[in-house]
From Swiss-Prot:
Catalytic activity: a quinone + NADH + 5 H(+)(in) = a quinol + NAD(+) + 4 H(+)(out)
One Gene Ontology term, aspect cellular component: plasma membrane
Molecular-function GO terms, alphabetical: NAD binding; NADH:ubiquinone reductase (non-electrogenic) activity; quinone binding
Membrane protein topology class: Peripheral membrane protein
Species, as recorded: Francisella tularensis subsp. tularensis (strain SCHU S4 / Schu 4)
Alphabetical UniProt keywords: Cell inner membrane, Cell membrane, Membrane, NAD, Quinone, Translocase, Transport, Ubiquinone
Purpose of the protein: NDH-1 shuttles electrons from NADH, via FMN and iron-sulfur (Fe-S) centers, to quinones in the respiratory chain. The immediate electron acceptor for the enzyme in this species is believed to be ubiquinone. Couples the redox reaction to proton translocation (for every two electrons transferred, four hydrogen ions are translocated across the cytoplasmic membrane), and thus conserves the redox energy in a proton gradient.
Subunit comment: NDH-1 is composed of 14 different subunits. Subunits NuoB, C, D, E, F, and G constitute the peripheral sector of the complex.
Name this polypeptide is given: NADH-quinone oxidoreductase subunit D
UniProt gene name: nuoD
Matches recorded under Gene3D superfamilies: Cytochrome-c3 Hydrogenase, chain B (1.10.645.10)
Family: Belongs to the complex I 49 kDa subunit family.
Superkingdom as given in the UniProt entry: Bacteria
Amino acid sequence: MAEYKNYTLNFGPVHPAAHGVLRLILELDGENVVRADPHVGLLHRGTEKLAEFKPYNQSIGYMDRLDYVSMMCNEHAYVMAIEKLLQLEVPERAKYIRVMFAEMTRILNHLLWVAACGIDLGAMTVFLYAFRVREDLFDCYEAVSGARMHAAYFRPGGVARDLPTQMPQYQKTRFTSKRKAKKLNEPRQGSMLDFLDHFVVDFEKSLDEIDTLLTDNRLWKQRTVDIGTVTAERAKELGFTGPMLRGSGVAWDLRKTQPYEVYHKLEFDIPIGANGDCYDRYLVRMAEMRESNKLIKQCVDWLRANPGPVLSDNNKVAPPKRNAMKNNMEELIHHFKLFSEGYCTTEGEVYVGTEHPKGEFGVYIKSDGANKPYRLKMRAPGFAHISAMDELLSGHMLADTPAIISTIDVVFGDVDR
């Protein structure tokens, strides 16, 4: 009589649905997954140790390269941890700018997620719709920092510069006709706040388009409903955070439960799911984008009415004004000291957790009073989610694997560090 054995399959690390360098060793019984063993570490770059050998203010750029889809949200937790060590006051305007860009980053992350998830499940159109909208937000990144991705815009004590009064303009190129450039530039004639007023209105329409494409789509529901189900109790036991936890029906969001910056002054809801499956996680992220859009609008209205400083006036932490530096020896010394050796913090340890688009992103710093951390540890939300891969995949078909991996929304820049 023939002997039947389970089949072992290597999924990744170069599979297009692996979302980075994920390697899964799957044990299959026919087309059913019996066991899944995730292997991580293929993108390890030693970020924590690198930051321990540099002054605090020279490691902000490393944060952008952790979860390289949610750049400013990584910076946010890091600079807040430094501010907590220094007991540094941040100008109110800078707090609103940070929150506004954190919510823009959340939208950037979720749009890329729904685009990639759509491609994984065979819905190509949503990818094109989502990337069209992301360009507008990348223009905002570029306007404040000069970079479209790795901005390094947040600073201990505030942000690098105030919002621009003129948005970057599109030019006629080989790929952009003069007529198209003129149309793209229509909402970009004023300040960034004017541009964002246009954006929050247009973005609601864009989300409605994606909703129409996917939410009630029969094929989309067949691929996501009752797939990768996790109960609320089990999600808490597994250490889930963010949309993975809220998709299981747990209303836990650090912006509400442990508010930081100015979130306690803003109005927004926490969307939660009911069944804890892939479809609920999709619905939660779609609803979160609408809430982020409301938060951006509230920040725009406040910033328009309240001009002011955007960086601390403590020149031991924040660089002095350039014209002052060129005319005053004291400011020149502050500038030289800041960019050569940085600043020393008080001895102690701090932990700051923020509501990152993927979950709780935390930064732990232990300081011995020097100008660099004695120990820096980062909590990546994706690590706990990857750890549950065996439980999520077991009992499902091999074809469901891309759907489950996709709704976890993992990026290996922060998992492997």
